[in-house]
Amino acid sequence: MVMTNSPQNIGIKGIEVYIPGQAVNQSDLEKFDGIPQGKYTIGLGQTNMAFVNDREDIYSISLTVLSRLIKNYSIDTNKIGRLEVGTETLLDKSKSVKSVLMQLFPGNNDIEGIDTVNACYGGTSSVINAINWIESSSWDGRDAIVVAGDIAIYDKGAARPTGGVGAIALLIGPDAPIVFDSIRGSFMEHAYDFYKPDFTSEYPVVDGHFSLSCYVKAVDNCYKNYSKKITGDANKTVGVYDHFDFSAFHVPTCKLVTKSYARLLYNDYVSNPSKFADLIDETTRKHIDGLTYDESLTDKILEKTFVGLAKDETKKRVQPALQVPTNTGNMYTASAWVSLASLLYYVGSDNLKNKRISIFSYGSGLASTLLSVTVKGDVSAITKVLDFDYKLGDGRKIQSPEDYLAAIELREKAHLQKSFKPQGSTDNLSQGTYYLTEIDDKFRRAYAIKE
């Protein structure tokens, strides 16, 4: 079937987020790890970290979030023409997560899309692919779904409290209340900042300080490339306060996002210093202006200056997007989109009409994009389904650091196993959650649904 009318207002029509039933408090983790109080909570900006034991994997959390999207939005699965998955949590070097999810589409085998992998960026690449499919001559009139999710865990050490778990499912199509703007700015580069070369371990190899610089560099370049497509001038930014009403980010830590929003303001300063004439004293200005670009990526005076200048706007325009991430930790591919969902929920539909929201997505290695959406319709039905007050409250249990460590140890024992039955408890799984029951002698996985 050839579509005669081009689709309008392509965007997000539904969102479901899966947050596991267990989390560990970061203050408790500080005490347990014997490190100074505030290092995880103030230094990283994190409050709680979601985790799972050996009962859940990327297949199960993807099945859970997608099945709930289908149920909560009464989706006719025959009217889905594209399904794509973004993840970096790989169970198989050949078989895709998307192929596992086809169980949820009985009678509909004509569904395009596959898995997209590059660190935390795969979900965003999948979203862009969905938009482009609907805009193309290949579109058959059906909607698309993007699933993004990961289990982010680290070996013992400084990076461990920056983990997390979660998944998101997005229903994408025309005539949506949350509409994608046509402008995007991307930045891609070869970098060994975070990668997973060891298939015998779930843990990544991380160059922490370098990765932070890569993230900030990506923020700069994506913002410049986005702005250039609007202003026509490579040296002129759109103005973060003028162009965006709210901002969501990929959230490795909430503290990094606070600094990155301020970095957008720094780019506005470089673009038009005269706008900041009364805001920055001469000594500080001379210091900032004397920095090389590489020095600017890590300079503490620059950082402190613009974090201070952006403080009030950060609270209004960014903080709502951090409410969920600070309470779950990093969801990798789902992170930027859960940040958007958090913002929608905590700002509320009435305050979002005709507002533009920037979304910055970053994946190590590296791939990054700044895109934006405009809220053109009522999103109260979406925020009702999200129900973060319950999911972050009575919908889960805060466990001890000892319980968290025990869950991680179960996952270590389960990695790469066959002829295996998981040992973890299912007590904290919510109704409708998929969980692993067995891995047979050919590595085939079987699941049940919590009743």
UniProtKB/Swiss-Prot annotation:
Keywords, in A-Z order: Lipid biosynthesis, Lipid metabolism, Steroid biosynthesis, Steroid metabolism, Sterol biosynthesis, Sterol metabolism, Transferase, Ubl conjugation
Catalytic activity: acetoacetyl-CoA + acetyl-CoA + H2O = (3S)-3-hydroxy-3-methylglutaryl-CoA + CoA + H(+)
Record GO terms (molecular function): hydroxymethylglutaryl-CoA synthase activity
PTM annotation: Is a probable target for sumoylation.
Active-site positions on this chain: 88 (proton donor/acceptor), 120 (acyl-thioester intermediate), 250 (proton donor/acceptor)
GO biological process: acetyl-CoA metabolic process; cellular response to starvation; ergosterol biosynthetic process; farnesyl diphosphate biosynthetic process, mevalonate pathway; filamentous growth; filamentous growth of a population of unicellular organisms in response to biotic stimulus; filamentous growth of a population of unicellular organisms in response to starvation
Top-rank taxon: Eukaryota
Pathway in which the depicted protein is active: Metabolic intermediate biosynthesis; (R)-mevalonate biosynthesis; (R)-mevalonate from acetyl-CoA: step 2/3
Annotated S-S bridges: none
Enzyme class: transferase
Induction trigger: Expressed during exponential and stationary growth phase. Expression is repressed by amphotericin B and caspofungin. Expression is also repressed during biofilm formation.
Entry EC no(s): 2.3.3.10
Keyword Magnesium appears in the UniProt entry: no
SUPFAM superfamilies, A to Z: Thiolase-like
One Pfam family cited in the UniProt record for this chain: HMG_CoA_synt_C
Gene3D superfamilies: 3.40.47.10
Family: Belongs to the thiolase-like superfamily. HMG-CoA synthase family.
Function: Hydroxymethylglutaryl-CoA synthase; part of the first module of ergosterol biosynthesis pathway that includes the early steps of the pathway, conserved across all eukaryotes, and which results in the formation of mevalonate from acetyl-coenzyme A (acetyl-CoA). ERG13 condenses acetyl-CoA with acetoacetyl-CoA to form hydroxymethylglutaryl-CoA (HMG-CoA). The first module starts with the action of the cytosolic acetyl-CoA acetyltransferase ERG10 that catalyzes the formation of acetoacetyl-CoA.
PANTHER family in alphabetical order: 3-HYDROXY-3-METHYLGLUTARYL COENZYME A SYNTHASE, HYDROXYMETHYLGLUTARYL-COA SYNTHASE
Name of the protein this chain belongs to: Hydroxymethylglutaryl-CoA synthase
